From Swiss-Prot:
EC number: 2.4.1.227
UniProt catalytic activity: Mur2Ac(oyl-L-Ala-gamma-D-Glu-L-Lys-D-Ala-D-Ala)-di-trans,octa-cis-undecaprenyl diphosphate + UDP-N-acetyl-alpha-D-glucosamine = beta-D-GlcNAc-(1->4)-Mur2Ac(oyl-L-Ala-gamma-D-Glu-L-Lys-D-Ala-D-Ala)-di-trans,octa-cis-undecaprenyl diphosphate + UDP + H(+)
GO biological process, one term: lipid glycosylation
Protein name, per record: UDP-N-acetylglucosamine--N-acetylmuramyl-(pentapeptide) pyrophosphoryl-undecaprenol N-acetylglucosamine transferase
A Pfam family assignment: Glyco_tran_28_C
InterPro entries reported in the protein's UniProt record: GlcNAc_MurG (IPR006009), Glyco_trans_28_C (IPR007235), GlycoTrans_28_N (IPR004276)
């Protein structure tokens, strides 16, 4: 039996692979526990979705790419985080650490190295994030979701493993999806989702274009928390702040999606063969990882993308029309993609790579 420490947090994407792998490790007879921040989204997700897994909070600071007084304060938070993580790891004595990235992971990876605990890290985006760039110096291996990411990493440490897509994704119930929306089964469905926080600009453009869009589609609009507009009441248009348990049913009836370009989400659409129009987070809100993801997917023929600062009512409709025009060829391109590793295969690889010299 192997004991595995998991870490990663700050965004949903830095937790989702762990949420998939932890149950696999338990099913295979191993032990698992989680190290994350005190108040991050990872704590909420792990404690609500995996209540039997012990969660250990540590101090953590944010890794900023710009000069700020907060950077000086956060150095001390990171140092304390290393001490916190070292204390936990010393007591729990895991055989290995699996890190999904995010700023909370850095002190855990450094602490693991100080205790000679082998670490495997995972990068979901096309270009490695700052946390994983730092952690790579202390890790045994880094796994990538995009094959092209290998060009940014040392050959002896990097392996392409592809996306780990949750198994229930393809079990959505179409009948349930139509019941939830009261949609016509004979008209196409457009799913619009602006990420966990929503996108005010995307929401506004969808609403300004509502009549034109409803001519061709029925619309499921996931607006983000607090961004539902109750004044809009039109047949064929439904709004939710966000959807959790019923999302697979809504995806089952979706023909086209307009979405952010987070790695986990776009690989789920790819797995389901849903053509996508991607509106990545801009450089004013991120390091540009979603822009790279979106460009990569467009270059492979999986859909189209519009930078958020260039998004207009006109080009939204133009790109959706272009997707409809080329729908058959887009889906054919999607069908050429093959998932590399099941979560069971990935877990076995983690164990092998971490524990074999």
């Amino acid at each position: 039996m192997t004991k595995i420490a998991y870490t990663g947090g700050g965004t949903v994407g830095h937790v989702s692979v762990n949420l998939s792998l932890i149950p696999t490790s338990i099913e295979k007879g191993h032990e698992a526990f989680y190290i994350g921040s005190k108040h991050g989204i990872e704590r909420e997700m792990i404690e609500s979705q995996l209540p039997d897994i012990q969660y250990y909070p540590i101090s953590s600071g944010k890794l900023r790419r710009y000069l700020s007084f907060e950077n000086a304060k956060d150095v001390f938070k990171v140092l304390k985080g290393i001490l916190d993580a070292r204390k936990i790891l010393k007591k729990q004595k895991p055989d290995l650490l699996f890190s999904k990235g995010g700023f909370v992971s850095v002190p855990v990876v450094i602490a693991a190295r100080s205790l000679k605990i082998p670490t495997i890290i995972h990068e979901s985006d096309l270009t490695p994030g700052l946390a994983n760039k730092i952690s790579l110096k202390f890790a045994k291996k880094i796994y990538t979701t995009f094959e092209d990411t290998l060009t940014y990493l040392p050959k002896d440490k990097a392996d392409f493993v592809g996306a780990t897509v949750r198994e229930d994704l393809k079990q959505g119930n179409k009948e349930r999806g139509y019941q939830l929306t009261d949609f016509d089964k004979n008209k196409k469905v457009l799913l619009v989702m602006g990420g966990s926080l929503g996108s005010k600009k995307l929401n506004n453009i969808i609403r300004q274009n509502i009549e034109a869009l409803l001519h061709d589609y029925q619309i499921i609009h996931l607006t983000g928390k607090g961004l539902v507009d109750d004044s809009i009441n039109k047949k064929g248009y439904v709004q939710f702040e966000f959807v959790k348990d019923d999302l697979t049913d809504l995806l089952a009836i979706t023909d086209t999606v307009v979405s952010r370009a987070g790695s986990n989400a776009i690989y789920e659409f790819l797995s389901l063969r849903i053509p996508m129009l991607l509106i990545p987070l801009g450089l004013d809100q991120s390091r540009g990882d979603q822009i790279d993801n979106a460009k990569n997917f467009e270059s492979k023929g999986y859909g189209r993308h519009i930078p958020e600062d260039q998004l207009t009512e006109v080009n939204l409709l133009q790109e959706l029309n272009d997707i409809e025009l080329h729908r058959e060829s887009i889906i054919k391109q999607m069908e050429t993609y093959q998932e590399s590793y099941t979560k069971e295969d990935l877990f076995d690889k983690i164990i092998h790579d971490a524990l074999n010299k």
